[in-house]
UniProtKB/Swiss-Prot annotation:
Function: Acts as an activator of hypoxia-induced mitophagy, an important mechanism for mitochondrial quality control.
Similarity remark: Belongs to the FUN14 family.
Record motif YXXL, residues: 15-18
Designated name of the protein: FUN14 domain-containing protein 1
Keywords: Autophagy, Membrane, Mitochondrion, Mitochondrion outer membrane, Transmembrane, Transmembrane helix
Membrane topology: Multi-pass membrane protein
Recorded GO CC terms: mitochondrial outer membrane; mitochondrion
């Protein structure tokens, strides 16, 4: 029995405790994907490659946005159409005064809180703007591809 206790202690000595947060800070996923340089993507790829990468990813995003957008617009429009048919047939009674009152209340609430934008949102917008400025070629390719994806 004494031998097992000594084995357990020696096994504990073989393992090293790793703090995952420190490891994650030192080994970021984008470093493995894009390389160790944290500068703009323009330093790593040619202009043609950047435009191609941005264009292809933008086209995919635009195409998906178009397809999903059509589906959502059809669902919302169909829901409004069914609501109007049910209202006209007498199945549903809509109190339009109450709807107008609630809409006006929501407008006032939005106007009051619009000036107090969340700091996370401001930080995200600033980071996005900085990314676009540093990677203008790939961003331009993405926008062009996105518009082509919407059109196709």
């Amino acid at each position: 029995m004494a031998d097992r206790g000594e084995d357990a202690e020696s096994e504990d000595e073989l393992y090293e405790v790793v703090n995952i947060t420190d490891y994650a800070r030192r080994h970021q996923w984008w470093s493995r994907v894009f390389g160790n340089s944290t500068g703009p993507i323009a330093e790593k790829y040619s202009v043609a490659s950047q435009i191609m990468m941005g264009g292809v990813s933008g086209w995919c995003a635009g195409y998906l946005f178009q397809r999903v957008g059509k589906l959502v617009a059809t669902a919302v429009g169909g829901g409004f159409l069914l609501l109007q048919i049910a209202n006209h047939s007498g199945y549903v009674q809509v109190d339009w005064r109450k709807v107008e009152k609630d809409v006006n209340k929501a407008k006032k609430h939005l106007k009051k809180n619009a000036k107090k934008a969340a700091p996370e949102l401001n930080t995200f917008i600033e980071d996005s703007t900085e990314f676009v400025k540093r990677n203008i070629v790939i961003s331009g390719g993405f926008v062009g591809g996105f518009l082509l994806g919407l059109a196709s």
